[in-house]
Amino acid sequence: MRAAYLLAAWISLAAWAPAVRASARPAPQAQILDGIVARIENDIITLSELRELGAYQQLLDGHSQSDGELRSELIEQWIVNNEASTTRFPSPAEAEVDREVIRIQSTFPNAAAYQQRLTTVGLNAEALRRVVGRQIYLARYVDYKFRSSIQVDDAAIADYYRNHLVPELQAKGQQAPPLEGLTDQIREVLVEQAVSNRSSAWFDETKSRLKITLEPMDGLPSGTRASQP
């Protein structure tokens, strides 16, 4: 979940705005033992979960993280879901999941191309909705946990504009719009950066207190290894 895969719903600031997304793991329930890639306290992370997350990343980006990165991602998702479910954080409405699925489908040229891509990466409609629902749940909880305590002042906004945005746009041969028209967008970027930094620190601190065992993944069955970036 590091600044890599939070649901891409925060902000879209041209090519220079950072985007992060992630997906929360559902509450523990009866599972078919298909292979264990990690043990956390009295729970497990399965190979099918790793495969599903990798397939989702391939659907969106054309590639996925490595197996080790996917496992790390799932461990952090477990941490978020464990706390969120303990506090009875509300699940997203079906209509919200519908909207995000429709948005994903709209990135493909037509319905046939979308269905073909789902088949290629190994996802069906039900699995996609499950992953999307987890994404929304996770992103919302992380935002809820950290956003309210983050303050961004005008000096920080001006500094970002002057020392980051303007040089990046100039390097691309583009002229930066006036700061006045970008204040709210830059503020959101800085808030999201702070949320990402605080969540990363939270993951590191929480993992140091958990009993986590990483299982060998060198012998994963054929066809289950996630594709590399």
Give the residues covered by each predicted segment:
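N-terminal signal peptide c-region/cleavage motif recognized by signal peptidases
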Residues: 17-19
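Bacterial N-terminal signal peptides
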Residues: 4-15
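Mature N-terminal segment immediately following signal peptide/propeptide cleavage
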Residues: 30-55
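A short N-terminal beta->alpha junction/helix N-cap motif
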Residues: 40-41, 61-62, 88
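Short, surface-exposed, low-complexity cationic segments
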Residues: 51-65
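Peptidyl-prolyl cis-trans isomerase
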Residues: 22-28, 32, 65-229
